[in-house]
Design a protein with these regions (language model features):
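Noncatalytic regulatory segments and standalone regulatory/sensor domains
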Residues: 74-186
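Cysteine-nucleophile protease catalytic domains, especially the papain-like/related folds used
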Residues: 1-27
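Active-site-adjacent substructure of cysteine-protease-like catalytic cores
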Residues: 27-77, 81
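Exposed alpha-helical structural elements
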Residues: 6-10, 29, 33, 95, ...
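Generic structural hydrophobic/aromatic packing signal, biased to beta-strands
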Residues: 34, 46, 79, 96, ...
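Hydrophobic, Leu/Ile/Phe/Ala-enriched alpha-helical segments that form helix-helix packing faces
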Residues: 11-15, 37-38, 256
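Charged, long alpha-helical assembly modules
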Residues: 178-256
């Protein structure tokens, strides 16, 4: 999805890594290219529709899923996926090809990418400050109303419309709750990751503003988890009061 590849692009830029992203409409060429990289000892990031992956216990269509391919044999591909999905996992080559080539929302044409070390040096402390500053600027000054604090505010009203027009409240809200907490987000819709990143950044830089930021994100992460828990309750009860509570929490988050 946009977040995943965007995060990878930012990491590559701030740490002077070389990021190569490629797509091809040819299923055979897509595999040949990745196979060559694996044969040369390169781990390859793949964009996949997790519906086809055999290690998913509850398969569903989501074409913005990413995993790292590190080996293969005549029958299977060996990947590293989220802890939720088992960490080191395998799926058949046929299922992998289907997952890479699936069409629909958020899909790509067999997208794959690699990260490589370059000769360019970087200063970790400078990179940390740059990354946090850029993230804050993007959040405060979103180019459209669907992202940043404006996107969260908009979501607070959109979920009410969603509830009222949904034809399958149980499945839709249960799936959303699962995506927010367990689908490679680290929990709390990525906020746990950013909370921990701010803590590690403070440990390195010892800046009071980073300590304050970390403390703020401890609370923000808990609020996001509350939203996902309310979505779960909505799926179980179909009670509008839980949507209203989630909407109120999203308004609070958007103002933080």
């Amino acid at each position: 999805n946009f977040f995943e590849i965007g995060l990878t692009q930012n990491i590559a830029r701030n740490l002077n890594l070389e990021l190569t992203v490629k797509e091809t409409a040819s299923t055979q060429k897509a595999w040949d290219n990745v196979k060559e990289l694996i044969d040369n000892g390169q781990v390859v990031g793949l964009k996949l529709d997790c519906f086809h992956l055999q290690y998913f216990s509850r398969p569903f269509h989501f074409a913005g899923h990413y995993a790292a391919l590190y080996n293969y044999d005549n029958e299977n591909a060996y990947l590293v996926d989220t802890k939720q999905q088992g960490g080191q996992v395998k799926t058949s080559l046929k299922s992998l090809a289907l997952a890479r080539a699936e069409k629909g929302p958020m899909s790509s044409k067999n997208l794959y990418y690699t990260l490589s070390i370059t000769d360019k040096k970087f200063d970790l402390k400078t990179s940390i400050i740059t990354a946090i500053r850029n993230n804050a600027n993007d959040y405060i000054n979103p180019p459209i109303t669907n992202i940043g604090y404006k996107g969260i505010s908009k979501t607070s009203t959109e979920i009410i419309k969603w509830f009222k027009t949904s034809k399958d409240i149980e499945t839709e809200f249960k799936t959303s709750a699962m995506m927010m907490e367990k689908a490679g987000t680290g929990g709390a819709l990525f906020r746990n990751l950013y909370r921990d990143f701010l803590k590690e950044s403070y440990d390195i830089l010892k800046l009071d503003k980073l300590k304050s930021g970390h403390e703020a994100f401890v609370e923000i992460a808990e609020l996001w988890t509350s939203v996902s828990q309310l979505f779960e309750k909505v799926s179980q009860t179909k009670d509008f009061k839980y949507i209203q509570q989630a909407s109120d929490i999203l308004k609070i988050i958007s103002n933080k």
